[in-house]
Amino acid sequence: MFKDVDIKFVNKEITPFGGLSLFFKMLEKCGYDKVLQECGLPEQGSNRGYKPWQLVMGLFAGVWCGACKFGHLDLVRYDRVLSKMVGWDVGAGHRAYQRYLNKFTQATNQKVFGHLYKWFFDNLVFDNYTLDFDSTVMVREGDQEGAAKGYNPRRPGRNSHHPLIAFVSDIRMIANYWLRPGNTSASTNYLSFLDDTLENLNGKKVGLVRMDSGFFSGGDTRLSGIQEVEIYHCL
């Protein structure tokens, strides 16, 4: 009934995440490590600290392995094969990621992610984008930074965030993302968000902008602001 299975011990280190080598090769082919070194990542205060690009790559590896909390990033540290795949002697612990991410400010985020967005779209051989804008509600439990009470159909009265998202549907790629308090509406400061998004696209032609009626709750003045931008159609 049962088949015989060959069981033996080996001295070789193994990992269930060997497929990630393809992702790392892709990033290497794109020159992503050089881009990280040029995008203005915060510097470490100690010469014993992990290099910024190593922490970013470790964060990528952790997310690709299924990490959804900082504590899960220790998986990358203790998987020696995974560390060797990216050329590390040893990976960082999860507290190293927490300490490093605390160095980011709003200005730093704008500088770093603006550079990364421009690099991505510069290397994308595609033009005449369809740009979609949308907002959503993210329910927050406990006392989270920036969370506030506002429109929340799933959990009325609970704190939430109300992020604003721009994405290019043609290539299924996020073009911009702002995390906002829950007491904001869809149209709150969205013209600045549009300007920031077009700057991320770095000269690419936008043939169509799509957004729902919530973005025009401020009246015709907001619509006229949209029309001043070089966009061919707006729905």
Q: Where do the language-model regions lie?
A:
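Dynamic "connector" segments at or just before major functional cores
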Residues: 1-200
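An internal, acidic/charged active-site-proximal segment
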Residues: 179-235
